[in-house]
Amino acid sequence: MPVVVDKDTNAAALGLAVGGEEGAAGRSFAYLHLGTGLGAGLVIDGSVHRGARTGAGEFGHQVIQLDGPLCECGNRGCVEVLCLGAVGRGEVAEAARVLGVAAGNLVGLLDIDVVLLGGRTVSGAPEAYVSGVGEVLGALARREGAGGDAVPVRVAPRGERIVAEGAAQLLLAPLFGRGDA
């Protein structure tokens, strides 16, 4: 019996890439998962990007506030500690803004087509997260002269099921000739 190990966010991204996120096939997107932690699954030109040492997607530990609060990883001002801190205080708008700033870094670095949001925390207030992240990306697009064409932000379809669907694809895709699982 084959065994495959991968990050939940990579599994979700794979599920979205091959499982029918409308317009995702062959495109580049970030799946941002906000739950008890914060991670990302990255799809570049239709394939999950894991990095040379499988470390791609450690989204929650990018530093965005140099003198910020201490994170459990040992850094200060990580997106995860700032975002989850706001969630813990009931400040959903602030959590969405912080998530948007970090998403803007991804958009600027990778020039992705769409940002998809998921996870239990996002499920609790999906409109607030889509709106908050979208506002930050819209401001970024205006500053960069993109003519107001911000990268779209949506809630990933199929909720928590997408992780399980992607995990199944990790095993099944190679059996059906899809080598980029």
Q: What positions do the PLM features span?
A:
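Phosphate-binding/catalytic loop of phosphoryl-transfer enzymes
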Residues: 1-74, 78-83, 175-181
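ATP-binding/phosphotransfer module of carbohydrate and carboxylate kinases, centering on a glycine-rich
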Residues: 20-25, 67-181
